[in-house]
């Protein structure tokens, strides 16, 4: 983490922490959505990160959400200062998968809006094929607003001399593409980013080992517990509950080496109640909720 007055040259900045529907969610008037409508501090944007290398004046976006215009404002001050007021186009975008909260912001880089020029988009082979062969995304490729760069899971890519990223596959609903997670490495520290996964048991890796190998972990926290789904078939939920993840990762959290935050929060999530038992439990167990604007120094 960074605090006011600290100097950090390589950062991961959290730009969005909600599930794909955002908070408030369209057409929903639950207490969490109503609270967000009445008080902007409870608004949450769709899932996204920025990777900032201030030494190289480079900025990369992880997942182009439909809130990308607002999310640019969260990096504007740092990057405008670093870039000498140049046009604030990212140096690349990395995509996890083809669900609406994670890639549809690409449309704003097209002819009708920012009109980017060969903006590198890093993604899996299947994701790249989806973009190239389906409109309106194929127009971005045709007009060379974006340039697709395929990621090979398990292989590092170098974004700047001080930043590298390793992608890996995770199990998830893969209607149009497969799903990736990322390890983002700076010169000193590393971040694990898994906003979507079917379950930790369904993965062919040990989540405890993966978390303990990094300094920060931003993990799928879509739902807090089965209480959000009375009468529902829990096998169809498709995300690990925060309560389950905390039970799995409690020994890791107690060690204190890795800071663990939950992100990708659904509007129904019990942890969104600032005075509720869920957020108290999360905090008392040594975990946290990711917040827009939060910076992780690498």
Enumerate the predicted regions with their spans:
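Cap/insert and terminal regions of metallo-dependent hydrolase folds
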Residues: 190, 198-295
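Core dinuclear metal-dependent hydrolase active-site scaffold
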Residues: 3-77, 81-84, 148-210, 294-298
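Structured loop/turn residues at beta-strand edges in well-structured enzyme cores
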Residues: 88, 101, 117, 144, ...
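Active-site neighborhood of phospho(di)ester-bond hydrolases with catalytic His/Asp-centered motifs
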Residues: 61-65, 89-102, 122-124, 192-198, ...
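A short helix-to-beta-strand connector/capping loop
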Residues: 8, 117, 141-147, 160-163, ...
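Short glycine-/acidic-enriched loop or helix-start segments at secondary-structure transitions
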Residues: 24, 71-73, 104-106, 132-133, ...
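A short, active-site helix/loop in glycosyltransferases that binds the activated sugar's phosphate group
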Residues: 126-136
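Active-site metal-binding motif and surrounding structural segment of the metallo-beta-lactamase
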Residues: 55-61, 65-122, 215
């Amino acid at each position: 983490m960074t605090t006011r007055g600290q100097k950090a040259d390589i950062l991961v900045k959290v730009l969005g922490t909600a599930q794909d529907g955002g908070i408030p969610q369209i057409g929903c008037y639950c207490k969490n959505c109503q609270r967000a409508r009445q008080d902007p501090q409870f608004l949450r944007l769709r899932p996204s990160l920025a990777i900032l290398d201030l030494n190289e004046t480079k900025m990369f976006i992880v997942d182009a959400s439909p809130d990308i215009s607002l999310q640019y404002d969260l990096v504007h001050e740092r990057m405008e200062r670093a870039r000498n007021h140049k046009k604030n186009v990212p140096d690349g975008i990395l995509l996890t998968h083809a669900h609406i909260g994670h890639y549809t912001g690409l449309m704003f880089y097209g002819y009708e809006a920012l009109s980017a020029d060969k903006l590198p988009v890093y993604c899996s082979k299947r994701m790249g094929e989806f973009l190239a062969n389906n409109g309106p995304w194929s127009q971005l490729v045709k007009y060379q607003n974006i340039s697709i760069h395929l990621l090979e899971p398990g292989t590092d890519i170098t974004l700047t001399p001080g930043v590298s990223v390793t992608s890996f596959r995770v199990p998830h609903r893969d209607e149009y593409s497969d799903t990736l997670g990322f390890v983002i490495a700076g010169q000193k520290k590393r971040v694990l980013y898994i906003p979507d996964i079917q379950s930790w048991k369904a993965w062919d890796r040990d989540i405890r080992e993966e978390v303990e190998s990094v300094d920060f972990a931003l993990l799928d926290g879509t739902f807090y517990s089965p209480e959000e789904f009375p009468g529902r078939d829990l096998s169809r939920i498709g995300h690990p509950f925060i309560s389950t993840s905390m039970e799995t990762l409690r020994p890791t959290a107690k060690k204190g080496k890795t800071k663990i935050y939950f992100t990708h929060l659904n509007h129904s999530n019990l942890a969104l109640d600032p005075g509720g038992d869920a957020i108290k439990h999360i905090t008392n167990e040594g975990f946290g909720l990711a917040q827009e604007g939060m910076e992780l120094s690498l």
